[in-house]
Each structure stands twice: as C-alpha cells, then as structure tokens.
A protein has these predicted regions:
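Short Fe-S-cluster ligation motifs
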Residues: 221-226, 230-254
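FNR/FR-type flavoprotein reductase catalytic core
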Residues: 68-203
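Short, Lys/Arg- and Gly-enriched loop/turn segments at beta-strand edges
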Residues: 46-54, 86-94, 224
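Local cysteine-cluster metal-coordination motifs and their immediate loop/turn environment
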Residues: 106, 177-178, 200-229
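Ferredoxin-reductase
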Residues: 1-77
C-alpha cells in the first residue's frame, strides 16, 4: 500500500469562527475534493483526522486534548498534514447540502466549488452558523437555529422536509450523528435513502485502512478508506446513529 507522507506546513492565519471553533489556514494547498479529510499531526501531542474546509484550511472544534493543543498554536507555527485521504462527496444533478454545526466544514468546499444548488445550515445559535455569509454568496442558503436567533426557529430536518428531498438527485450531509440519522430517516420515508451521502466521523489511528479502528459494524467498511462518505442505503443497517467506538474499541452511545 502506498503510504502518503505527512507534509509540514506553516499556519498562515487563524480565524475565530466562534468561541470554540477556529479555521486554521496553512501555507500549502492540497488537491482536496469536498469530503476529503487529512490526518493532522500536532507536534508533541497526537495525529487526528480533520476534514478540509478549503484546499488550504481545516476548521476545528475544540473538544479534547489534541484540539486544545491545536488551539494553543499561533500563526507561524508548524503542523503536519497527511492527505487528502478517503473518498469525498460525488454529487450529480440537482444537489442539496445539509450541515449542522462544524459539519459545515467539508460542505463549505462543496458550495464554494459550485457543486451545491441549495444549502441548509443549522446551529444552536446565530453566532455558530459557520460560513453563512460566504455560503449565501455562492448558493441558495436557508438557516435554522435551535434558539431562533437567525432563520428558522428549529432544526435543519424541518427545513429538509419542507424542501421536498425526493426532488433532489443528491443530498450531501455532515453534522452531529443524531442529526444525520434524522436526515436519513426522512430520506427513508421519502423512498430515496440512496440519494443521501453522509460524512461519518469515527475514531481513527492510522487513517490509511490498516488498523481497523474505524470499521463500521457489521459490514466492516473502513471509514478512512471506504469513506468517510457513504450513501444512505449502505449505512441503513449499520450502527450509524446508535453508537461509535472509543480508542479501546468499546461502544460509546451516540
């Protein structure tokens, strides 16, 4: 198997998207397509998977030790990028993107490359609607917030039902797994789960398909190599929306 090396890059800009989310822009562009991810090496800490939000950027939510270490870095510091890895979104025909929270990161690239006709963006509150101004310039954007501070007062799933999902050829989805599971349920009800393309997040050790830590029950498909994007009909009978696994392989309820 051809091993993709980790490439050192310099952080050229850090954009605070919200109190807990930052975009790290780096000195090199990678041939990433929407949905591709990379393994990010944080010196002295760990190597973690992150989706590309641009061909020279990742957008990160601070959730643990590794991301906390990343947030401690400054412009001019170096990190390692191994990628692009995995498969990506492969939209055909009329395409809708549905994003929740930091799940907007890989779908941002889809929109900026002109591959999304319509976009549904959700967050808890207005200040957490990632890239909303940029997305409004390149696609037909509708927003939903849990607290009603911007756009629809409610969830992206409510906007999805109103959008007639069966009328789209492709529906690209990324966000909290509970949200994505609800989107899949809507597509099942509409009789078109195969139109959904879902970007999954699983614990990864290697990112290149060797260790098996990111395999999906019961198919054995590897999120890092066979994914991270899967169609709804492929994951419909998996653990998707029920549980993930931690570093030791133990189940963690969603």
């Amino acid at each position: 198997m051809h091993e993709i090396p980790s490439v050192p890059v310099v952080i050229t800009d850090i954009i605070e998207e919200s109190p807990s989310i930052r975009t790290f822009v780096f000195s090199r562009r990678f041939p990433a397509e929407p949905g591709h991810f990379c393994m990010v090496w944080i010196p002295g800490t760990d190597e973690i998977p992150m989706a590309f939000s641009a061909q020279n950027a990742i957008t990160v939510q601070k959730v643990g030790e590794a991301t906390e270490a990343l947030f401690a870095l400054s412009r001019g510091d170096k990190i390692g990028i191994k990628g692009p890895l995995g498969n990506g979104f492969s939209p055909t025909g009329r395409t809708l993107a549905v994003a929740g929270g930091v799940g907007a990161a890989p779908l941002r690239l889809l929109a900026t490359l002109g591959m999304a006709d319509d976009f549904i963006l959700g967050a808890r509150t207005a200040g957490e609607l990632l890239f909303s101004k940029e997305l409004a310039d390149v696609t037909n954007l509708k927003c939903a917030t849990d607290d009603g501070t911007h756009g629809h007062h409610g969830f992206v799933t409510e906007l999805l039902r109103a959008a007639d999902p069966a009328s789209y050829d492709t529906i690209c989805v990324c966000g909290p797994e509970v949200m994505m599971k609800a989107v899949l349920a809507i597509l099942i009800d509409a009789g078109c789960p195969e139109k959904g393309q879902f970007s999954l997040h699983r614990y990864m050790k290697c990112g290149v398909g060797i260790c098996g830590s990111c395999c999906i029950d019961h198919s054995g498909l590897r999120v890092c190599r066979d994914g991270p994007v899967f169609t709804g009909d492929v994951i419909i009978n998996s653990e998707f929306g029920s549980y993930t696994r931690d570093a030791s392989g133990r189940r963690k309820p969603i």
